[in-house]
């Protein structure tokens, strides 16, 4: 059995990625596993999912939602600490391993930085990926 196909959905929060993934699962003849960043975020211990956590706190080491000002507007920014970055790297490689075992995958992610796309390219380099 060969590697599975990978469909990559990238977009901002609430852009409809999960809805599109669900529709694709219904329409495609083969089974596609929907794997989302949210699943890995939710799998982190609660103390590593911060809300404006200070430097050095567990929430700042994982995924930290930080309020900030941009052009006079209050917005939120997602900051990943060392544990959060480790989880993201592991997630990308887990997705690649899943596909290499012959499973078709729909990735539902948000590429916060260009380095994340580069890391996906390394992890998925030998697989067929549709963006």
Describe every region a protein language model picked out.
Residues 25-90, 96:
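Conserved substrate/cofactor phosphate-moiety recognition/catalytic segment
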Residues 12:
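P-loop (Walker A) phosphate-binding loop of NTP-binding proteins
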Residues 18:
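Walker A/P-loop
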Residues 99-104, 110-131:
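ATP-dependent NMP and nucleoside kinases share a basic, alpha-helical "lid"
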